[in-house]
C-alpha cells in the first residue's frame, strides 16, 4: 500500500491537497473477519456495513494533529459498533494520540464527534472533520497573527459580518469567514462535559482574498 494517500472523492481542492500533501496511508485493518463475531454480539448488519464502508474510505489515513482535542485521532480506523436501537449506534473513528477523557466516534447519521460524558457531534461527516483540519493548516500558514481564547471570551466573540464556512459541515465546531480573517470555534468539549470553561476559539487575522477563497 502506498504511503502517499489518494484523497477520497468529494473533498475540496484545499482538503485534497492537505490529505495528499501532508497525510500518510498506513496498512488498515480488514474488518471482514469481524463480521460474524459482531453479528453474534447482536450488532445489526447495517451498522457493520457502515463501519466497513468507513474503513474502506478512511481507514489507515494518518493526518497532522488538529488544533484542538489534543490533535484528534492518530489514524482514522473503525472498530466494533456500540449502542442500541433506542440510543442509536456509533463506532470508533480511531484511537487518541494522547490519553483523553473522550474518544472519537462516528454517529448514527455519519457525524464525526466525541464520546464524552455524552455524545457530541462536531461535524456532520468525516469529510467535515478533514475539511476543518485542512482549513486550520491553511489559515495557520497564511495568517499574519493567530489569537487563541477560552471560556467566557469565546461567548463574547462578535461574529457580525462573518459567514459560516460550509465545507466544514459544522455542528458543535464551526468556522467563520470575515473580510480578512477566519475564526474557528470549538465547543465540543464544553458541550460534551457540560464545562463552559472548555470553550475555545482560534482567530486568524491578516488573510488576503486568495487565502480566504473557498
Regions found by a protein language model. Give the residues of each.
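A surface-exposed partner-binding patch
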Residues: 1-119, 134-189, 204-213
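Flexible glycine-rich active-site/ligand-binding loops centered on an Asp-His dyad
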Residues: 122-135
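Short, conserved beta-strand/beta-arch hydrophobic-aromatic motifs that form part
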Residues: 197-203
Amino acid at each position: 500500500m502506498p504511503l502517499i494517500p489518494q484523497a477520497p472523492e468529494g473533498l475540496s481542492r484545499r482538503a485534497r491537497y492537505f490529505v495528499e500533501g501532508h497525510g500518510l496511508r498506513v496498512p488498515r485493518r480488514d474488518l471482514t473477519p469481524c463480521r460474524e463475531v459482531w453479528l453474534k454480539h447482536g450488532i445489526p448488519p447495517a451498522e457493520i456495513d457502515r463501519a466497513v464502508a468507513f474503513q474502506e474510505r478512511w481507514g489507515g489515513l494518518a493526518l497532522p494533529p488538529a488544533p484542538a482535542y489534543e490533535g484528534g485521532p492518530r489514524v482514522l480506523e473503525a472498530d466494533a459498533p456500540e449502542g442500541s436501537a433506542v440510543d442509536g449506534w456509533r463506532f470508533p473513528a480511531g484511537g487518541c494520540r494522547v490519553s483523553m477523557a473522550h474518544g472519537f466516534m462516528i454517529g448514527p447519521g455519519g457525524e464525526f464527534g466525541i464520546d464524552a460524558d455524552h455524545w457530541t457531534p462536531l461535524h456532520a461527516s468525516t469529510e467535515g472533520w478533514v475539511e476543518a483540519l485542512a482549513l486550520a493548516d491553511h489559515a495557520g500558514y497564511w495568517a499574519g497573527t493567530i489569537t487563541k481564547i477560552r471560556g467566557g471570551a469565546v461567548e463574547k466573540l462578535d461574529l457580525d459580518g462573518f459567514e459560516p464556512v460550509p465545507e466544514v459541515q459544522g455542528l458543535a465546531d464551526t468556522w467563520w469567514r470575515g473580510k480578512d480573517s477566519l475564526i474557528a470555534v470549538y465547543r465540543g468539549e464544553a458541550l460534551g462535559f457540560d464545562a463552559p470553561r472548555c470553550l475555545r476559539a482560534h482567530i486568524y487575522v491578516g488573510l488576503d482574498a486568495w487565502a480566504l477563497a473557498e
